[in-house]
């Protein structure tokens, strides 16, 4: 009999693992992920968390071994391209792009090499762990190159004489700089995504997903929003409201003992910069507070 516990695969270590754990916690899942176990059970919901290698997650989701997976778009796209080149079917459903795991896949060359565009690497040796994405980029340019497949430490390839350039994930660029390389072109930008198995799930599992998705959406909206409170003169309300970025219609309340002053409360979907606060003050606003929001649900 098929278990009715929802199975979610996540990366077993690294930054994406830490961000996934934080997401589970913020969604109210009680789970002990400190012990090095393959499967961890959520205490307050019928969910099991599987911790695996990131490049195993797309296959586990597609084959229905797990119901959901948290994976970088770069890994997902690479697996899809490689399978397509081998004539193997691949289908998963992306439920939501998440607000973490951001990175970019970039070309990099030695510092002393002049780069004038992708054509300057035509016919050159390029080391990478993402041959599918790299080939697609050069195919779209109508250019050929020699792929040097490396599973790790791609950045040392030019210095070791294995390649003329590299194509690797970049976050700060510090690793490239330490190896005498410079980033010259971004070929793919990626974030983490929540993906689902292609086949329909049971009603019980779908109900769990329908509970999780609004929580994830609420957490992401909360991180992107601020709660703003201020006092404002009545005759300046329109001008003050126009200054609040991405704001919905505000809540207006009469201040006790004040006939010309009101309290204004609003959720803003954008950052309120110091310059905006100074403009609000210049219009007569006072007691301006900008507060973080922990959770939201529309």
From Swiss-Prot:
Q: Name one GO biological process term.
A: L-histidine biosynthetic process
EC number(s) on file:
2.4.2.17
Name the keywords, alphabetized: Amino-acid biosynthesis, ATP-binding, Cytoplasm, Glycosyltransferase, Histidine biosynthesis, Magnesium, Metal-binding, Nucleotide-binding, Transferase
Q: Which residues form a coiled coil?
A: none
EC main class here is transferase
In Gene Ontology terms, what is one molecular function of this protein? ATP phosphoribosyltransferase activity
- Cofactor(s) needed for function: Mg(2+)
Subcellular location field: Cytoplasm
Q: What is its main location?
A: cytoplasm
- Magnesium keyword on record: yes
- Give TM regions: none
GO cellular component annotations, sorted alphabetically? Answer: cytoplasm
Superkingdom, taxonomy of origin? Bacteria
* UniProt keyword annotation of Signal present: no
Activity modulation comment: Feedback inhibited by histidine.
Q: In which pathway does it act?
A: Amino-acid biosynthesis; L-histidine biosynthesis; L-histidine from 5-phospho-alpha-D-ribose 1-diphosphate: step 1/9
Q: What reaction is this protein's catalytic activity?
A: 1-(5-phospho-beta-D-ribosyl)-ATP + diphosphate = 5-phospho-alpha-D-ribose 1-diphosphate + ATP
Q: What does this protein do?
A: Catalyzes the condensation of ATP and 5-phosphoribose 1-diphosphate to form N'-(5'-phosphoribosyl)-ATP (PR-ATP). Has a crucial role in the pathway because the rate of histidine biosynthesis seems to be controlled primarily by regulation of HisG enzymatic activity.
Family membership: Belongs to the ATP phosphoribosyltransferase family. Long subfamily.
Can you name this protein? ATP phosphoribosyltransferase
Q: Which organism is it from?
A: Aeromonas hydrophila subsp. hydrophila (strain ATCC 7966 / DSM 30187 / BCRC 13018 / CCUG 14551 / JCM 1027 / KCTC 2358 / NCIMB 9240 / NCTC 8049)
